Regions:
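Short loop/turn segments that connect beta-strands within beta-propeller blades
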Residues: 72-76, 116-121, 158-161, 212-216, ...
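Repeated scaffold domains used in trafficking and secretory/extracellular systems
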Residues: 40-49, 86-95, 129-141, 175-184, ...
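A short beta-strand motif characteristic of beta-propeller blades
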Residues: 28-39, 77-83, 122-128, 162-174, ...
Length: 312
């Protein structure tokens, strides 16, 4: 009987520990470093870090106009803002540090990419790359681009010819409830921002799904879901920059430490999903597990005592 109770105790402790550990992978974001009121009929879409500047695209709701904003990442002050014509949905933006160009993708089924100067932040030209990409990131280590369609990703050379006609990643989040946002390469991994689309039946959860360049899923990092819809992720000075369309009608950018990333097993991925539920429901799962565990122990004790009496 003592052994049975010991095993039960170890099981419960392990379960609680795993839930506690993985619930803590939700980033606790502090005050935003950049915040401004939404401009009528415009919302945050893509953005990128260009040297020490943050290049931001606000997309008009009818896709016919856009606003470009540029912020100094050392002071977080706005240094440029101007209205521009259509950049499509402008779902993602990336910066090529080798040619000093900024690339804005039209998205929404288009293969157009708009190129801006990395010093003046002014439009230069439009190119077509052959695929209707929805996310883009420049991979400085290999002088390539990684692009995402819906659930697949391809690699382009620096002249926007395909490295291979086969995708390097397949089967990414295909749920209709998921709002797929921008992605960014950082130190060997791609960080892919997603939002659980409320109007499509989602929960409003914000997440970063992390992959390597072989298409292997590493882990998931969850962010504060009360802020608003996450639009992308980028990096500066070994910190993560997260941008949101806030539920309070403000556009916000947060700076966060980068969590350590290790490749997760399937079991860990399941535990993480449960951990998100725990956080979302104010730890109701803790209470339920506790009650069930206590009931199991009581029932086992009663059964064992009854058997002992029968033997006597």
């Amino acid at each position: 009987m003592k052994k049975v109770l010991l095993y039960i105790f170890i099981f419960i402790c392990t379960l609680f520990f795993n839930i506690w550990v993985y619930a803590d992978t939700t980033l606790e974001l502090k005050e935003p470093v950049i915040v401004f009121d939404k401009i009528a009929h415009y919302g945050l879409q893509g953005y990128t870090v260009a040297k020490d500047k943050l290049f931001v695209v606000l997309e008009g709701y009818d896709d016919t106009k856009s606003i470009i904003k540029v912020f100094d990442l050392n002071t977080y002050k706005e240094i440029l803002s101007y209205e521009y014509g259509s950049l499509g949905h402008a779902n993602d933006v990336t910066y090529n540090s080798k040619n000093n160009k900024i690339y804005v993708i039209a998205s929404s089924g288009s293969d157009k990419v708009f190129i801006f100067n990395g010093d003046t932040f002014k439009y230069e030209k439009t190119i077509r790359i052959g695929l209707p990409v929805r996310s883009i990131t420049y991979i400085e280590d290999y002088d390539r681009y990684a692009v995402r369609l819906i659930g697949t990703g391809y690699l382009y050379k620096n002249d926007f010819t395909l490295v291979s006609k086969f995708p390097f990643i397949v089967g990414m989040n295909l749920s209709s409830e998921v709002g797929r946002q921008g992605w960014t390469y950082y130190k060997g991994l791609i960080y892919y921002a997603n939002w659980s689309w409320v109007s499509q039946g989602g929960t409003g959860t914000n997440a970063l799904f992390i992959y390597d360049l072989d298409g292997n899923k590493y882990t998931s990092i969850y962010t504060d879901e009360s802020i608003g819809e996450i639009e992308g992720v980028d990096f500066y000075n070994n910190k993560m920059i997260l941008g949101f369309n806030g539920y309070d009608k403000k556009i916000k950018f947060y700076v966060s430490d980068i969590p350590s990333v290790e490749k997760e097993t399937k079991n860990q991925e399941i535990i993480k999903k449960e951990a998100v539920i725990v956080k979302k429901k104010n730890y109701e799962v803790y209470i339920i597990i506790g009650i069930v565990s206590i009931l199991v122990i009581i029932i086992l004790v009663i059964i064992l005592r009854h058997k002992k009496k029968v033997i006597k």
